[in-house]
Amino acid sequence: MISTAVIMSALELGCIYALVALALFLSFRILNIADMTTDGAFTLGCAVSATIAVAGHPLLALPAAMAAGACAGFITAFLQTKLKIPSILAGIITNTGLYTVNLAVMGFSSNVSMVKADTMFSLVKPFLGSFYKLIPAAVLTVVIGILLTLFLKTRLGLSIRATGDNPDMVRASSINTAFTVTVGLCLSNAMTALSGAVLAQYQKTADINLGTGMVIIGLASLIIGETLMPKGKTWMKALGAILGSILYRFIIAIALRLDLPSECLKLISAVIVALAIGLPAIKSAVRPATKGGKA
């Protein structure tokens, strides 16, 4: 039996990690770029958020983390568009460099504690009672999801979508694809860093390894969401990413309740992503065999 506390925790974490799913929805699905900056950008958001919160500015930490994440996305885009480095390799290079940057932000310490510091959650606790973590996380995620959906309907947003669909056609239309890719990656990593910033204040700690495997977690949430919302408008796909993240956290909660070792969670995530991405190939391989068996 899953307790109320476990359900609340799954909802809270699902809303927080949904920002990563939305970020990957923009980079992986809209721009069609496998951005490997995600892990480092998430930790960067954690580091910036914790450092500024400890200094006494927990709310200022959120836009600051987003700005830092956007800078990380800009570097990846610069490597990709100006230096012509393949997108995956560009993300890996940026992610590797961010390890040192994140350590520097945290004062060359592997973790930062916020036990004695105010957070965005502790500030609203007197007003929201037992929902002081869920409501801010849910509202923030919904607002970001709405803003992303509205942005993708603007002229620039449509240009970004077109760049992911057919970059050659976009270039023929005199649209600067380097600019659209840069904007897309900056926004994507800003959302990832915001997720890390909120998680750091949620846990009241930031650790250099918090972002490890985040791209897999985000992809798992995104793909689960696409299963829930396979077709539809942009807002439905964004909603699917959010719901997928929440459902993923419930899957993890159930796995922990079944006494599965916590070390196995990353493996479970990897298997979910591999099966979901490879599902079309599996279906096409099974159908001919089934028809042959009937014949």
Model regions: which residues?
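Transmembrane helix-bundle core of multi-pass membrane transporters
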Residues: 87, 93-153, 182-183, 264, ...
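Transmembrane alpha-helical segments in multi-pass inner-membrane proteins
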Residues: 192, 196-267
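Helix-loop-helix "hairpin" substructures at the membrane interface of multi-pass membrane proteins
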Residues: 72, 130-210, 215
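Single transmembrane alpha-helix segments in multi-pass membrane proteins
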Residues: 4-57, 78-83, 223-231
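Loop-to-transmembrane alpha-helix initiation sites
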Residues: 13, 88-89, 115, 133-138, ...
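Cytosolic-side transmembrane-helix boundaries in multi-pass membrane proteins
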Residues: 165-172, 176-179, 232, 236, ...
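Short loop segments and helix-boundary regions at transmembrane helix junctions
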Residues: 31-34, 74-119, 124, 204-208, ...
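Alpha-helical transmembrane segments within multi-pass membrane transporters and channels
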Residues: 24, 57-96, 141-145, 244, ...
